[in-house]
Every structure is written in C-alpha cells, then in structure tokens.
UniProtKB/Swiss-Prot annotation:
One of its GO terms (biological process) is neuropeptide signaling pathway. FMRFamides and FMRFamide-like peptides are neuropeptides. GO terms for cellular component: extracellular region. Keywords: Amidation, Neuropeptide, Secreted. Belongs to the FARP (FMRF amide related peptide) family. It is found in: Secreted. The modification Leucine amide is found at residue 11. This is Extended FMRFamide-9.
C-alpha cells in the first residue's frame, strides 16, 4: 500500500 509500517514496502 502506501505509507504505513509494513505496508510501506509494497508501494
């Protein structure tokens, strides 16, 4: 996803 903690890696 977008901006998070673990979500940040899969922009």
């Amino acid at each position: 996803g977008r901006g998070g903690s673990s979500n940040y890696v899969r922009l």
